[in-house]
């Protein structure tokens, strides 16, 4: 014990000479206070981290809610048996950013997956996370018992029309949804199967996954149970391959962020391939099979790629249909353009005279994509390409106004940029 006291005395007081201590008698108290403050701050950080984790990560609540409703026969799905009976759908690392939207990495059928489910209604009903689930009273109330197959088809058609607009291909999408709902492949859709697919469709990401299912740049939907769903895991969930930890992002200045990103980013030819994939995705959603879609969070954190450096959208919840945005803007009061913003950056103009938002987004998807690609592609780019690449990206970033009114110009810029990049990496191992 005496040795321990000596060690503490040496650590706290030896850096200060005895002469200085005699001149500054309060220095010992200051050192003790600093030591106590360090312990207090460290304990507070640990406590806050634990509290934040326990608040955000409620995978056990998610499983409890879903499995309770599955065992009652209220819901169904292709992943229910593995989740609730055999427990081969395993929750692993918590990735949630909101307590009402649970996101976990996991493992299912010998592959890495992402598991997502919502617990909002349960938390609203009772602050105790272990209380009996009552969410089926709110979420799984449609269709009601006695609804015929034709009536359910009509429900689906009207829902898709309201969210995707008048599209000639909606009938095919309804058939695709009914096939997905028929989990046991008996050619019929039970009430539990219908309730599950109806709840699932009300999740923006699922609606977009089904609408963009034929596109190679979105995550594949692997299974569901009620409104819990499982998607493929994207190996690299950031444009730069890795992300700076959250607690460091606020501490480090933006120039340091840029240096870290450049250091972690793939080689330039691989970045060019990823960029081509992003441009192809922008092209696909510009006037797709099921209407137009808008990227409403153009952060590099929402763009990833797989082992082959093929572009992948990390989170389709950040993408919105044209009908969704128009519904948000319709009749909306505004004082300035920022009042007309859906998501992070889908902004329409504010009519200052009428004090209402206009219906059309100012900045098209392509301009947002080019803003992301400017730093991403120019750093380390081949010298014989840099000047022309910079020129085309600058032109691309100036795109604005109603995209449908400048479709030819939009397509020309996109194709020129794709061609420029593809010529540089074609006939190489990177292509």
Curated annotation (Swiss-Prot):
InterPro entries for this protein: EF-hand-dom_pair, FAM69_kinase_dom, FAM69_N
UniProt GO cellular component terms: endoplasmic reticulum membrane
Xref: SMART domains: PIP49_N
Pfam families: PIP49_C, PIP49_N
Lumenal side: 52-431
The record's account of how the chain is modified after translation: Among the many cysteines in the lumenal domain, most are probably involved in disulfide bonds.
Ranges facing Cytoplasmic side: 1-30
Localisation per UniProt entry: Endoplasmic reticulum membrane
Membership in a protein family: Belongs to the DIPK family.
Name of the protein this chain belongs to: Divergent protein kinase domain 1B
Lineage: Eukaryota, Metazoa, Chordata, Craniata, Vertebrata
């Amino acid at each position: 014990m005496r040795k321990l006291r000596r060690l503490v005395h040496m650590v706290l007081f030896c850096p200060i000479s005895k002469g200085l201590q005699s001149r500054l008698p309060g220095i010992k108290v200051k050192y003790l206070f600093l030591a106590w403050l360090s312990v207090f701050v460290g304990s507070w950080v640990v406590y806050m981290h634990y509290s934040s984790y326990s608040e955000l990560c409620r995978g056990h609540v998610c499983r409890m809610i879903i499995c309770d409703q599955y065992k009652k026969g209220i819901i169904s799905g292709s992943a229910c048996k593995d989740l609730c009976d055999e427990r081969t759908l395993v929750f692993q690392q918590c990735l949630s950013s909101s307590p009402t939207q649970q996101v976990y990495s996991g493992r299912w059928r010998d592959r890495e997956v992402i598991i997502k489910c919502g617990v909002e209604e349960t938390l609203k009903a009772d602050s105790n996370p272990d209380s009996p689930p009552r969410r089926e009273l709110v979420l799984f109330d449609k269709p009601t018992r006695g609804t015929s197959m034709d009536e359910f088809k009509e429900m689906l058609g009207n829902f898709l029309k309201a969210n995707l607009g008048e599209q000639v291909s909606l009938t095919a999408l309804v058939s695709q949804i009914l096939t997905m709902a028929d989990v046991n492949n008996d050619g019929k859709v039970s009430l539990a199967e219908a309730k599950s697919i109806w709840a699932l469709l009300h999740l923006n990401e699922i609606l977009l996954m089904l609408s963009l299912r034929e596109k190679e740049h979105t995550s594949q939907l692997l299974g569901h149970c009620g409104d819990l769903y499982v998607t493929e895991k994207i190996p690299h969930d950031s444009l730069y391959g890795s992300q700076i930890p959250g607690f460091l992002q606020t501490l480090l200045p933006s120039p340091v962020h840029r240096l870290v990103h450049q250091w972690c980013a793939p080689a330039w030819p691989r970045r060019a391939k990823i960029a081509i994939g992003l441009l192809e995705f922008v092209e696909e959603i510009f006037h797709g099979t099921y209407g137009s879609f808008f990227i409403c969070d153009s952060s590099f954190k929402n763009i990833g790629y797989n082992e082959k450096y093929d572009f992948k959208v990390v989170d389709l919840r950040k993408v919105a249909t044209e009908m969704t945005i128009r519904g948000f803007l319709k009749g909306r009061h505004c004082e300035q353009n920022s009042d007309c913003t859906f998501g992070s950056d889908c902004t329409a103009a504010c009519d200052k005279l009428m004090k209402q938002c206009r219906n059309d987004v100012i900045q098209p998807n392509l301009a947002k994509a080019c803003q992301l690609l400017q730093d991403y592609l120019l750093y380390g780019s081949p010298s014989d390409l840099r000047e022309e690449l910079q020129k085309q990206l600058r032109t691309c970033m100036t795109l604005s106004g109603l995209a449908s009114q400048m479709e030819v110009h939009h397509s020309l810029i996109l194709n020129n940029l794709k061609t420029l990049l593809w010529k540089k990496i074609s006939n190489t191992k990177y292509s």
